[in-house]
């Protein structure tokens, strides 16, 4: 099994939030790429591989659910998390139907983010293992 890059694409239209999350992820030892909207995220994802993508749901032009669908076409094995301050249990089921693997609520605490990222990379390793065992 090859070693996965510790890379995360984080998408949010709020600059202060992007900077804060970037700082947290760097403290956790991850290489972070930031995108300010869905269009920029798609451009980046077409050029580079990210095992984990975290995206805001409410963005101008293309929202997070549409972005998730388009990202799945580019990278079907990535773990994609929704990031929003307006999630309910019903929403989380709908997000899974769209293609999200999980979600984080704003504002996110450092320990919650750390736990979610660790869980995401466990999922990525499991997917990679299943793909390697598929004939």
Named regions from a protein language model:
Residues 59:
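Receiver (REC) domain active-site loop signature in two-component systems and cognate sites
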Residues 15-33:
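Two-component/phosphorelay signaling modules centered on CheY-like receiver
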Residues 36-40, 63-67:
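Acidic catalytic/metal-coordinating carboxylates
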Residues 108-118, 125:
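C-terminal output helix
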Residues 66, 87-103, 115:
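Alpha4 helix (beta4-alpha4-beta5 surface) of REC/receiver domains from two-component response regulators
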Residues 49-54:
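Active-site beta3 strand of CheY-like receiver
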